[in-house]
Amino acid sequence: MSTSVLLLRAPAGTPDRYETAFSAAGHLCTSLPVLETALVNGDALRTLVREQGRCTYDAVIITSARACEAWGAAVDSLEDGPTQGTMQASDWTGTPFYVVGSTTATALAAVRAAHPQSPYAPSDVRGESSGTSQELARFVLHDLGDPPHPRPLLYLTGDKNRDTLPDILAAGGHQLHTVQVYETRGSSRFREDLDAVLRLPIHRDTALWWIVFFAPSSSEFTIPFLQEHFDLRGVDNRLLATRIASIGPTTTDFLRETAHLTVHAMASKPTPQHLLEAIQASDSGLHR
């Protein structure tokens, strides 16, 4: 009989560091994505792209591939949809688009490649060498020059953003018009993916499951699905025998105080090795 570890997070890289650490220690380890991103406010963005442009904004700032996807979806819709009568289309070809890194630059280049003659597709993409939002903000300040800047910058964001870039640009005299174009939410496939994990042959002889939680928000989302299969509270032997681990104190507090679950192991630091050591220590006490 074996022990299986279920990591409630998407694997990062190949190989994934958490999966590598647990597999090397003899555990059957599976990562299960919990969250997904989805585009939002598509109609509002489409209207903005159609009706605004350089006359309204000094520049556009995009710091994620998802935001690039949102702009591309708006361009696709405008170019492939019905014409807007005699209304003059806005022109974004002369508007600078500032991006973080090569991934976002490549994503915007793909929009232009798909619609090479479109007035909505970005042509002037800058800042690719910036590795972080902070570096990009300083690049924008230098590139646009000294105030005054009467027109705002259009900033496409998700629902979870740090204030670093807006704060730096505001301090430099720029006004931002922020538009949320995507959001992070619980995976629509989580139940299906969980069932698929439980059907894997490698878990057929599992005697004990360790379920590892990585954040309060994902914990809250997953618990209703997990408790259909796992004995999270240690009271129902018809379900899969389970112990609970946490990546750190914030998640532990949520699990104990809000979800009213017992946390059997907590990583002293949020690393694969510290998580593994916490689970091994708990297992040692269990088998004495």
Task: Locate each region found by the language model.
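Conserved beta-alpha
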Residues: M1-R288
